[in-house]
From Swiss-Prot:
GO terms for biological process: DNA-templated transcription; pollen tube growth. Zn(2+) binds at C21, C24, C38, C41. Pfam families: Zn_ribbon_RPAB4. This is DNA-directed RNA polymerase subunit 12-like protein. One of its GO terms (molecular function) is zinc ion binding. One of its GO terms (cellular component) is RNA polymerase I complex. InterPro entries: RNAP_P/RPABC4, RPABC4, RPABC4/Spt4. It is found in: Nucleus. It comes from Arabidopsis thaliana (Mouse-ear cress). Keywords: Metal-binding, Nucleus, Zinc. Belongs to the archaeal Rpo12/eukaryotic RPC10 RNA polymerase subunit family. SUPFAM superfamilies: RNA polymerase subunits.
Amino acid sequence: MDLQQSETDDKQPEQLVIYVCGDCGQENILKRGDVFQCRDCGFRILYKKRILDKKETRIGV
């Protein structure tokens, strides 16, 4: 196994995370290494957007 092959096998696709600005409410998509700041207003308090799995959703609520 070559060194280059092992590096490509270990790489995972970049995960994008959606954050909501605490000031203006704009959704921001950030990846690892991005500046943790709203792209519209520059506010630095962002909240991670919750994503519900199918098993977590409740029927009839």
